[in-house]
Regions:
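A detector of single, family-specific signature residues
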Residues: 1-409
């Protein structure tokens, strides 16, 4: 016997609907997202399993505390795309009305009737899950850093563009220079002796100090005094926000690099021609996971990463368009792999150049190269083997294919 659970998750209360194999309602309940609420629900799940009942659950997310809770209690979890749920609602209600219990009911019945078209969640190891969380949090900090850098750059351009020629706004020099000389007037009032003294105190060479002094003595953009006062205050506020984020990004990068170095997968993932350090290889492996059988084929992986287009056929018409529905984080890191490989892999460079010669844009050529890399990465992931450039080139030679049309056997 099997029960199908529909779980409409929320921050405070989860709606749950349970049906049997015939679609008959077993129970419906609201589960509070508290220790008591989850504990009571867990005991009910354990009782059903003790009676020999298989439990399958449909939920609109592949991770999170509720998903972990269900897995801990032996429930087979099926993540459901929100778009699929939206279309399934029409089976039960054409008015467009919805509620949390109704969505839970739709999820339960959708899983009962359409589970052959869904894939059960195959959770990775705890170490792989931790690495994934670390890389996701690092990317959030990087996005926050980028936002603040853009704001700070725009602010300096508005009243003090010369400061942008002194140093990158995320650098240690900028961290010291901007608070010390927050306005063009502060720099104009400097003597060369004062500047040289400040430069020596902050570790600048005599040559570098001389170059910067020449920059600072150039005429500054004429800006009204009230604009300078307002923008200088904003600059200081942005610097106070930016510097801790810059430090956090550096700490996350080191933590990820150190954490991944202790994992067995580092032995093969680090062999890709993308540099032996940094967070690209750890992020790639974190998105792949280590659950056996998660990826059925390299084509499955390519589609999940958005590296191959979508083809729509109807009668004599055929339309090929960009694949929007995919793992955006995986697509981003595959683009990074493709870009970094241009510096170290001869065949990758040749393939990219061939794509550009055909009139494809940089992004299109990079995406096509990423699709090629995913064929190789799938084999590396599946067999847990390192990348061997010479083996790959020999494979191309055996197949008598030009480097721009390479395949990995």
């Amino acid at each position: 016997m099997r029960y199908y659970l529909g779980v409409d998750w929320a921050d405070q209360t989860h709606a749950v609907w349970v049906v049997d194999e015939s679609g008959t309602k077993i129970t419906a309940r609201a589960v509070a997202h508290t220790a008591e609420g989850l504990g009571e629900w867990g005991r009910e799940l354990d009782e059903w399993r003790a009676q020999g009942i298989d439990l399958w659950a449909a939920i609109e997310r592949p991770d999170g505390r509720v998903v972990d809770f269900l897995l801990d209690h032996g429930v087979v979890v099926y993540p459901v795309n929100p778009k699929a749920l939206d279309r399934a609602r029409d089976r039960f209600r054409q008015s467009g009305a919805k509620s949390d219990p109704f969505d839970a009911r739709v999820l339960a019945d959708f899983l009962r009737t359409d589970h052959a078209h869904l894939r059960a969640l195959l959770p990775s190891s705890e170490a792989a899950q931790e690495l994934k969380l670390l890389t996701e949090d690092c990317q959030r900090h990087i996005r926050q850093q980028t936002r603040l850098v853009n704001q700070l750059t725009a602010t300096l351009k508005a009243y003090y563009p010369r400061a942008l020629e002194v140093a990158e706004v995320t650098s240690a020099l900028a961290r010291e220079f901007l608070p010390a000389y927050p306005t063009p007037a502060a720099v104009t009032a400097l003597t060369e002796r004062q500047w040289q003294r400040w430069a020596r105190a902050h570790g600048l060479s005599a040559a570098r100090a001389g170059d910067l002094w020449a920059v600072l003595r150039q005429p500054h953009l004429p800006v009204p005094a009230h604009v300078v006062r307002a923008k200088a205050r904003l600059m200081q506020a942005l610097m106070e926000q930016l510097m801790p984020v810059v430090a956090a990004v550096a700490q996350y990068r080191k933590a990820i690099d150190d954490f991944f170095a202790r994992m067995p997968a580092a032995r093969w993932a680090r062999t890709l021609p993308i540099g032996k350090h940094g967070i690209t290889a750890p992020t790639l492996w974190a998105r792949l996971g280590d659950a056996p059988g998660r990826w059925e084929s390299f084509r499955h992986l390519q589609a999940h990463a958005g590296a191959v287009p979508v083809t729509k056929r109807s009668g004599k018409q055929q339309v090929v368009h960009f694949r929007f529905a995919c793992d955006k984080a995986l697509r981003h890191v595959v683009d990074q792999v493709a870009f970094l490989s241009l510096l170290s892999s001869a065949w990758a460079r040749a393939y990219y150049d061939q794509q550009r010669a055909r009139g494809h844009s940089h992004r299109q050529a990079l995406r096509a190269l990423g699709a090629k890399w995913l064929k190789i990465i799938f084999v590396m992931w599946q067999r847990q083997v390192p990348y061997d450039e010479q083996y790959h080139l020999a494979t191309m030679t055996r197949q008598q294919l030009p480097q721009g049309q390479t395949q990995f056997a």
